[in-house]
Amino acid sequence: MNKAGQEARGFFIVLSAASGTGKTSIRRIFLERCPEVQFSVSYTTRTARPGEVDGQDYFFVTETDFRERIDQGEFAEWEENYGRYYGTSGKVMTRVLEQGRDMILDIEPRGAKTLKKNYQGGIYVFVLPPSLAELKARLRKRGESEAEIRKRLDKVREEIAEARGYDYVIFNDSLEKAVERLQVIYQAEKSRASRMSKQIQGVLDSE
């Protein structure tokens, strides 16, 4: 892609984390502060949680519907997680990026790996808990059983190991600080010289 095409096209941030790390809260506050960024609404077969809105938090669909979308090649990535399916629409993603808008995607490490193979130019950010002990306490507060917590922690260890393959790592030791760190990453990526050739030329022509 030439410089003009790279500058005109938006870029996307992939935000991943282990379960219970606070990724959703970070993403929501980030979007409030950076309204120019569009959230990629995923499809899922899980039921909506209290307060979630169809088409805003997720597109809630049946497993039959989801499988039909897989067969039609609609997803840029999809995965099964705890018996439920999640997927990102490739068509929507391509359209938004070609319009020059930036996006943020909230997906798990396995889905991020698939996306990385299929789409270039993404910025991959992994959110870490301060410690596994802190994460265990958060899961207990959510009312999960000890057996479920042990099961989740086994998977969490596998997910956290994937952080080494990401571009950036954010510790969620404080929600406010975590959001600020994500904002800094976004602004730094926006300021890359490869995305600023129009502004550079504007200064050169400003005499």
UniProtKB/Swiss-Prot annotation:
The UniProt annotation places ATP binding at A17, A18, S19, G20, T21, G22, K23, T24
What top-level class of enzyme does the UniProt entry assign?
A: transferase
Per the database record, which ranges form the Guanylate kinase-like domain? 10-187
Record EC number: 2.7.4.8
* Any Pfam family: Guanylate_kin
> Which keywords has UniProt assigned to this entry?
ATP-binding, Cytoplasm, Kinase, Nucleotide-binding, Transferase
CDD domains per the UniProt record, alphabetical:
GMPK
Top-level taxon: Bacteria
Location comes to: Cytoplasm
Q: Where, if anywhere, are coiled coils annotated?
A: none
GO cellular component annotations of the record = cytosol
Principal localisation? cytoplasm
Catalytic activity as recorded in UniProt: GMP + ATP = GDP + ADP
One GO MF term on file is: guanylate kinase activity
Residues crossing the lipid bilayer are none
Q: Which family does it belong to?
A: Belongs to the guanylate kinase family.
Purpose: Essential for recycling GMP and indirectly, cGMP.
- This protein is called Guanylate kinase
Task: Give the organism, scientific name.
Answer: Syntrophus aciditrophicus (strain SB)
